[in-house]
């Protein structure tokens, strides 16, 4: 018999621990293979035995997040973090937590856990790449450079790593190091570039030249080196336009104007429709101020490129002789009208904007003379498009009757062209007839139901006319409406900012209309007889709901815009690595520049300014708390203490009816799936107790961090800081406004008067801040304002404003009107002054001010 060799038995705890770790590693592999449910099953088995197994808690949170159970995922991750002392967990646990935080877009936390994974002994060098990506996302380029370098050291065989290191060095101002990095790889890859890699190689060569050019600045020797490098790489570069433009710029900096002009002529030959090249050619030839030489130049260029616009158009911008200019205008405009070019007016509109007094009467005479010689039957194409041109001409001059006359002539002749309906609607819009304008566009839309442009234009006009239901109906013809009654959800999904902002503004206007009607009904209720009071009470309840609904929906739609822009910002995350893999460093740097000004884009700023009206009003209403004001947020009218059972029963019945109505109406206004949105009407938004904090978080903070000083809206800054009690910042905004627009501006006067009155003893602002602002006003503007009259209640500030700043600055007057409760100005007199100053404005602007501002 053989004797069994005796072995020392392993402790049970160690066996269990090894089994647990094996199970965890298996669960981790399943997660990596996207088999989340199987991974969860293994993790549940581990946690059943040891509920404090931190690695399993973290991985389970990540698994749950991956299957969509985000609330449970957050709970497990929070539990795991609670059990960790500081960041002293296993490298795998820290890595898992880093991935989870990245998925939830908590980038700073993700960086913390990825760093912890490396500090705790992780050998996974891929973490450096993820770390660099996240650091780039939050703008921490200094640490991103460290991470890029570590990753590059670990994986030297990939060009993307060399490119990403060079980009990181460039962004951190280490330009020579970036050049050296790119040059080093070029030496290693010399003669080994395959056809599929040639584009990437071309981009990296041009990127290297970009860095050299930035580093050279105006140094002549360095610029010569940049030029030499450009000539050396020219055969390998695909972007010939970029290369030639750079070459011409360097020649200009070196003073080699003749060489620069040759390059610009080459660029014009390659793309004769680019206006920029012609203007730069003028500069390189040194003839910008010599109209005679410019005329000769463009005469020759027109012969070389007879079918191109710039040589024909540019002389129209500088010719001074009336007869010569008239001749050139005739040669430029009439052939287009003969061919029936719809964009003829658009082509010459820059001339109207820059040389209105000289060009406008000449073109009017030329085109009217041309029209008088046309036969509508024999020359139908020139006839209709000449009328179309003249209608646009008179619309630009704000001669609306004549504009209507000519577009009607075109429509009477050919009522089947959509462009004519669009122009007629524009004219009616300027006249303030929004309902009629929308109706005209609807007629035009019916002519071509497959045209998305006319569809969107019609939607926009219906929204401007406050006909939201019809606008949504028309917009929904081009949306996916699989799981909803209209296209609202799809328009949010595709981030159609133009529609959402227009709809928000329409809701805001409806809110103002209903609020005004509600105030009128409340006043009427006190005056009418008892037999009519019940009907009025019902009308009040109806309007209360509509006020609340429109206000909430307006704010809801405005708040959708920053969500889109946050998504745009988050979308950059993938490109921090994608652009390096694809070898497009120049495009990547353009994206970084775009991201730095993301929250200053026109649509975002427009939504922010409109939303500020609601947030500021909510803040002001909250502060007033007048006992005699009608509370628009309540669901029912106060019943003077009567609490009979019949009234309670009635109230209960009304509440049930309202809930049913909300359910019905929610289907047509819901912007998101029901499981993602529990506040369809935005009621929680308008019930906030912190409107200014909400405005700052949603809009203002991002805007304020990114906006350039020369683009900043100082009025918005002033109003925001005024409401949060930061008078010193209000003065700073006033001061900057004065430097940009002068101290004669009506808006400057209005802002200063409001700020002056904020320093009175009876205002709720900080006494120290009031003293600081008073001293600042005395120092800077003592000659502009009667500062000693600030405590004089009988002083006529409106008369002072009128004498000092005039009475025609409508924006300044409207600003004063908004703060009429804070400044002792007779609101009726101010209102009369505003109305009397409306005459220079277009009818639609007059209507808007009368209806929504006063």
UniProtKB/Swiss-Prot annotation:
- Function according to Swiss-Prot or TrEMBL: Non-catalytic component of the NatA N-terminal acetyltransferase, which catalyzes acetylation of proteins beginning with Met-Ser, Met-Gly and Met-Ala. N-acetylation plays a role in normal eukaryotic translation and processing, protect against proteolytic degradation and protein turnover. NAT1 anchors ARD1 and NAT5 to the ribosome and may present the N termini of nascent polypeptides for acetylation.
Query: How is the protein modified post-translationally, according to the record?
Result: The N-terminus is blocked.
- Which keywords are on file for this protein? Acetylation, Coiled coil, Cytoplasm, Phosphoprotein, Repeat, TPR repeat
The TPR repeat ranges on this chain: 20-53, 54-87, 91-124, 126-162, 241-274, 384-417, 452-485, 728-761
Give the residues annotated as coiled coil: 623-667
Which compartments does it reside in? Cytoplasm
* Residue positions, PTM Phosphoserine: 674
Q: Which residues form the signal peptide?
A: none
Q: Does the keyword DNA damage apply?
A: no
User: SUPFAM superfamilies, per this entry?
Assistant: TPR-like (SSF48452)
Name used for this protein in its record: N-terminal acetyltransferase A complex subunit NAT1
Which organism does this sequence originate in? Answer: Saccharomyces cerevisiae (strain ATCC 204508 / S288c)
* Quaternary state and interactors: Component of the N-terminal acetyltransferase A (NatA) complex, which is composed of ARD1, NAT1 and NAT5. Can self-associate. NAT1 associates with the nascent polypeptide chain and the ribosome.
Q: InterPro entries per the record?
A: NatA_aux_su (IPR021183), TPR-like_helical_dom_sf (IPR011990), TPR_rpt (IPR019734)
Superkingdom of origin: Eukaryota
Organism taxonomic ancestry: Eukaryota, Fungi, Dikarya, Ascomycota, Saccharomycotina
Additional remark text: Present with 7600 molecules/cell in log phase SD medium.
Region feature (Disordered): 626-668
Where does the record place the modification N-acetylserine?
2
MF terms in GO: acetyltransferase activator activity; ribosome binding
**How is this protein annotated for GO cellular component?**
cytoplasm; mitochondrion; NatA complex
Q: Which SMART domains match?
A: TPR
């Amino acid at each position: 018999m053989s004797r069994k060799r005796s072995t020392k038995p392993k402790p049970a705890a160690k066996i269990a621990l090894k089994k647990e770790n094996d199970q965890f590693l298996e669960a981790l592999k399943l997660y990596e293979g996207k088999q989340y449910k199987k991974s969860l099953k293994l993790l549940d088995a581990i946690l059943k035995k040891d509920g404090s197994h931190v690695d399993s808690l973290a991985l389970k949170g990540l698994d749950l997040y991956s299957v969509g159970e985000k609330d449970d995922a957050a709970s497990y991750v929070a539990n795991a973090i609670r059990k960790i002392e500081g960041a002293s967990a296993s490298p795998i646990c820290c890595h898992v937590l880093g991935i989870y935080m990245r998925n939830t877009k908590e980038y700073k936390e993700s960086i913390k856990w990825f760093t912890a994974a490396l500090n705790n002994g992780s050998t996974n060098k891929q973490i450096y790449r993820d770390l660099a990506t996240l650091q780039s996302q939050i703008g921490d380029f200094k640490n991103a450079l460290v991470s890029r370098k570590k990753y590059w050291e670990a994986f030297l065989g990939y060009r993307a790593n060399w490119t990403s290191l060079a980009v990181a060095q460039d962004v951190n101002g280490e330009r020579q190091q970036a050049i050296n990095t790119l040059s080093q790889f070029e030496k290693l890859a010399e003669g080994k570039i395959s056809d599929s890699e040639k584009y990437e190689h071309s981009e990296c060569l041009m990127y290297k030249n970009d860095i050299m050019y930035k580093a050279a600045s105006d140094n002549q020797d360095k610029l010569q080196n940049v030029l030499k490098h450009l000539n050396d790489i020219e055969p390998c570069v695909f972007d010939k336009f970029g290369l030639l433009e750079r070459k011409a710029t360097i020649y200009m900096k070196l003073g080699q104007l003749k060489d620069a002009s040759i390059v610009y002529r080459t660029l014009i030959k390659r793309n004769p429709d680019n206006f920029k090249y012609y203007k730069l050619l003028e500069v390189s030839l040194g003839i910008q101020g010599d109209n005679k030489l410019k005329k000769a130049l463009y005469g020759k260029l027109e012969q070389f490129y007879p079918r191109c616009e710039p040589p024909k158009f540019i002389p129209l911008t500088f010719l001074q002789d009336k007869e010569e200019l008239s001749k050139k205008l005739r040669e430029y405009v009439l052939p287009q009208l003969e061919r029936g070019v719809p964009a003829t007016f658009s082509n010459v509109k820059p001339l109207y904007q820059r040389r209105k007094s000289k060009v406008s009467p000449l073109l009017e005479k030329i085109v009217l003379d041309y029209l008088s010689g046309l036969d509508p039957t024999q020359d139908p194409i020139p006839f209709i498009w000449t009328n179309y041109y003249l209608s646009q001409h008179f619309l630009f001059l704000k001669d609306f009757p004549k504009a209507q006359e000519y577009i009607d002539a075109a429509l009477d002749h050919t009522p089947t062209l959509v462009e004519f309906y669009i122009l007629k609607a524009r004219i009616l819009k300027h006249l303030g007839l929004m309902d009629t304008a929308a109706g005209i566009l609807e007629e035009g839309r019916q002519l071509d139901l497959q045209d998305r442009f006319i569809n969107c234009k019609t939607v926009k006009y219906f929204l401007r006319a406050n006909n939201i239901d019809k606008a949504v109906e028309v917009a929904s013809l081009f949306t996916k409406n699989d799981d909803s009654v209209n296209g609202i959800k799809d328009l949010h999904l595709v981030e159609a900012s133009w529609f959402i902002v227009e709809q928000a503004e329409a809701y805001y206007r409806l809110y103002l209309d209903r609020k005004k009607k509600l105030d009128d009904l409340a006043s009427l209720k006190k005056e009418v007889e008892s037999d009519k009071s019940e009907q009025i009470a019902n009308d009040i309840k109806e309007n209360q709901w509509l006020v609340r609904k429109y206000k909430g929906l307006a704010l809801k739609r405005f708040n959708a815009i920053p969500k889109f822009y946050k998504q745009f910002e988050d979308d950059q995350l993938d490109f921090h690595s994608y652009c390096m893999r694809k070898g497009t460093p120049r495009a990547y740097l353009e994206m970084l520049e775009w991201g730095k000004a993301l929250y200053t884009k026109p649509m975002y700023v427009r939504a922010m300014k409109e939303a500020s009206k609601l947030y500021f009003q909510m803040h002001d209403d909250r502060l007033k708390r007048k006992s005699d004001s009608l509370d628009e947020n309540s669901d029912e009218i106060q019943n003077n203490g009567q609490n009979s059972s019949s009234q309670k029963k009635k109230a209960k019945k009304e509440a049930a009816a309202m809930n049913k109505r909300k359910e019905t109406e929610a289907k047509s206004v819901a912007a998101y799936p029901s499981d993602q949105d529990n506040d369809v009407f935005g009621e929680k938004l308008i019930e906030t107790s912190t409107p200014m904090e909400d405005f700052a978080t949603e809009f203002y903070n991002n805007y304020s961090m990114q906006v350039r000083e020369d683009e900043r809206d100082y009025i918005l800054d002033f109003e925001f800081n005024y409401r949060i009690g930061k008078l010193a910042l209000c003065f700073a905004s006033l001061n900057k406004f004065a430097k940009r627009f002068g101290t004669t501006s009506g808006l400057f006067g209005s802002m200063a008067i409001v700020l002056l009155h904020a320093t009175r003893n009876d205002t709720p602002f900080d006494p120290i801040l009031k003293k600081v602002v008073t001293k600042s006003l005395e120092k800077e503007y003592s000659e502009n304002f009667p500062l000693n009259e600030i405590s004089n209640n009988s002083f006529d500030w409106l008369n002072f404003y009128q004498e000092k700043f005039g009475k025609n600055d409508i924006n300044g007057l409207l600003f004063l009107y908004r703060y009429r409760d804070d400044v002792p100005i007779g609101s009726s007199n101010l209102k009369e002054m505003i109305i009397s100053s409306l005459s220079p404005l277009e009818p639609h602007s007059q209507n808007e001010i009368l209806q929504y501002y006063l």
